[in-house]
Regions:
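FAD-binding core/adjacent interface of flavoenzyme oxidoreductases
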Residues: 1-9, 65-170, 247-254, 265, ...
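A conserved FAD-binding loop/helix module that cradles the flavin
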Residues: 307-338
Length: 492
């Protein structure tokens, strides 16, 4: 049986940060297990920007954030291995393409992979960092047939961004979580017609900035207080029935509306991935779907810690990293003899919501009533413009009053003022997409790319079209310029 001080299960942002933190805090025997063939977790398919503002101090795409997190782990191991530090060389072993089937309260791990088959691992401490999963159609109980073309937004994201498959031509998004909003924009950039985003609640579930840059920028209507009440089609989806709902979210008879479409993407919530937690006898919080935990993220089973979306769903990867750093430190201290805090696991784990991160607020709701293809709403002849700032996840509600210079209110920082003034005269955006790459064996793969800085919003489609027609040659590294003004955000 293999033995380690700490075993981290999951190689996404939480797992990478937890392993790094454990090494920094004196642990010299760490195993990081990832079921995929590469590290990074869900970040690898999240090619959009918006990551890293807190942890790295700059806006990154998901693959860039994953690359930086891995580089941080490697650099930490290298610096701690310096003989001048006087510390024992830390060892962080990584097992990819390895599936963990079960963990026990005694911290025995049962796993398997193609190389080693079935094997057991013993650990002094375990850090759970398995992330979360989407609610599928079965959990939503949508009536109707079971044709092709109905899938979660995350699955569609993988098909489009990783595999290069187009999932449909006429698309409806059910739910307004951030992944659904982001995929609405992504589908338009890939040539699909996104007919609507439908939300059962009276306000969107995603961040206000994503309402602006994913829906309003591309003329995609958002319908609130509505839901899908039937799915139609035999082999392929042919359409859906949409109904209004009352205050109890019950469909209202007589409000049905038919929409012809071939694809329905579900963005209706995330659930912590906790099958392993339950098998280990860890108490699960019914409010979060994740484990009860102490202030240092130790679960109800001594020596088993949890961090990231497996503990509770986060809005921002930066907050996942912050939480994982704490969990890694606590696990290292536990291994070195610190007392367990398992008896302090409570029903309200410490949450990092970010600084005023919020969904669309009531003061911004008027923007939904405007032409979604416009840059912002205005109050008649007064030329007062209302908009949501997209600079950071805070999503401030801005008002621009004409003058010389224009007066901007509602912003929390100077960047918001600059954004608002520019948004009226020359709106700018960053394009993120994928490009085909010819590998060394002659096969065609795909990597993520972005515009090298912001470009005029009206040039988004022309640049996207140019990228989609291009095949580049490998090798390509993160940060390489693959076309004039276009840089790679992942590598071959």
């Amino acid at each position: 049986m293999r033995s380690y001080d700490i075993v981290v299960i999951g190689g996404g942002p939480a797992g990478l940060a937890a392993a790094k933190s454990a090494a920094e805090n004196g642990c010299t025997s760490i195993l990081l297990i990832e079921r995929d063939t590469k590290l990074g977790g869900i970040l690898n398919q999240c090619i959009h920007n918006g990551f890293g503002l807190s942890h790295f101090g700059e806006e990154l795409t998901g693959p860039e954030y994953a690359f930086r997190a891995y580089e941080e782990l490697k650099n930490t191991i290298g610096s701690l291995s310096d003989p001048k530090s006087g510390k024992k060389d830390p060892a962080v072993e990584i097992l990819l393409d390895t599936f963990v089937m079960e963990i026990t309260p005694e911290k025995t791990i049962y796993a398997m992979n193609k190389k080693d088959g079935y094997f057991e691992i013993s650990a002094k401490a375990i850090i759970l960092a398995m992330g979360c999963r989407e609610k599928a159609r079965g959990a939503l109980a949508i009536p109707g047939t079971r044709p092709a073309g109905v899938m979660t937004a995350g699955l569609a994201q993988h098909y489009v961004n990783i595999d290069g498959y187009m999932v449909g031509k006429r698309v409806v998004i059910l739910g307004s979580g951030d992944i659904g909003l982001i995929m609405a924009r992504r589908m338009v950039l890939e040539g699909a017609e996104v007919l609507a985003c439908i939300e059962i609640a009276p306000q969107p579930g995603g961040l206000a900035r994503n309402i602006t840059q994913c829906l309003q920028d591309y003329g995609i209507p958002l319908y609130l207080r509505k839901t899908v009440t039937a799915i139609h089609g035999k082999d392929r989806l042919t359409g859906i029935t949409v109904s209004e709902v009352d205050e109890k979210y019950t469909p209202i008879p007589g409000t049905e509306q038919e929409i012809s479409c071939d694809t329905l993407l579900l963005s209706c919530g995330l659930i912590p991935e906790n099958e392993l937690s339950r098998k280990a006898g860890i108490s699960i919080d019914p409010k979060t779907g994740g484990p009860f935990s102490s202030d240092v993220h130790e679960t109800s089973v001594p020596g088993i810690f949890a961090c990231g979306n497996v503990l509770h769903v986060h809005d921002l990867a930066d907050n996942v990293t912050k939480e994982a750093i704490e969990a890694g430190k606590a696990a290292a201290l536990y291994v070195s003899g610190a007392p367990s805090t398992a008896d302090q696991a409570i029903s309200d784990p410490k949450v990092f919501p970010g600084k005023a991160v919020k969904p669309l607020n009531s003061s911004s709701e008027k923007a939904l009533q405007q032409d979604p293809s416009s840059d912002g709403s205005s109050d008649g002849d007064t030329e007062v413009h209302h908009m949501t700032c997209i600079i950071c996840p805070r999503g401030c509600s801005l008002t621009v009053t004409p003058g010389n210079p224009p007066k901007v209110t509602g912003n929390a920082c100077p960047r918001g003022e600059n954004y608002a003034i520019a948004e009226i005269s020359h709106p700018m955006r960053t394009l993120t997409t994928t490009i085909r790459v010819r590998k060394e064996d002659g096969t065609i793969g795909r990597i993520s790319v972005k515009s090298n800085g912001e470009i005029p919003k009206q040039e988004i489609f022309s640049l996207a079209g140019k990228i989609h027609k291009t095949i580049i040659e490998s090798p390509v590294g993160v940060g390489d310029e693959v076309l004039p003004g276009v840089i790679a955000t992942s590598s071959t």
